[in-house]
């Protein structure tokens, strides 16, 4: 590890108790990426590897989510060599402390340490982890930090590793992801500022929010029970109807906001586990 100044002595906070996402905000377009920083060296930044691919003969490019600098790309020089210390450290779904240098879009990794304290993902949880990583790559612009999203990703991996129901964990993560990247998810009030009623039917306008179901709504907008919207607001998925309708709603919203671009891991989840 490098000995740069300003190292964070406690890079990863303990995951908070699970619960409903934060307060609602008006729907808006995704934020633009933050201007590239002028910092040449960053030391001991909490991070997770989202994806990696070969770079030249012996190196890797790693796409990482960091707490304070957002999603960035780093060159891990020599990481493919048989005896490289980085080979066993740069793993997905494990908390890391990374250091790097450079001002270009592709920076140079200068140090990496495994923080530890997290169980490995396996089975369905592993598939869900790859799905979460793909969503982060698709929705998070480079160098656009989202500390609350970083923390919720940590919580999501922890919940998956401890065997919590994947359906509930994924729906909660999807909502936080959309909110933090600019797509608010107001579920307890309609666009007319009326409270959602559990016994009524609604549709979700991707650009405006919850609307009363009616003949003027496009046919491809899913019809959702008010009870489902209220349950999602409270992160409560014990009703079978809520499980089914929340999956339909989130699939519709993610597909809309991605412009129809398919998610490879979503199709795997649909085919294997219907998550």
Curated annotation (Swiss-Prot):
InterPro entries: ARFGAP/RecO (IPR037278), DNA_rep/recomb_RecO_N (IPR022572), NA-bd_OB-fold (IPR012340), RecO (IPR003717), RecO_C (IPR042242). GO terms for biological process: DNA recombination; double-strand break repair. One of its GO terms (cellular component) is bacterial nucleoid. Keywords: DNA damage, DNA recombination, DNA repair. Residues 1-38 are annotated as: Disordered. Residues 8-24 have a biased composition (Low complexity). It comes from the Bacteria. Transmembrane segments: none annotated. Disulfide bonds: none annotated. It holds the Pfam family RecO_C. Belongs to the RecO family. PANTHER family: DNA REPAIR PROTEIN RECO. NCBIfam families: reco (TIGR00613). Involved in DNA repair and RecF pathway recombination. This is DNA repair protein RecO. It comes from Burkholderia pseudomallei (strain K96243).
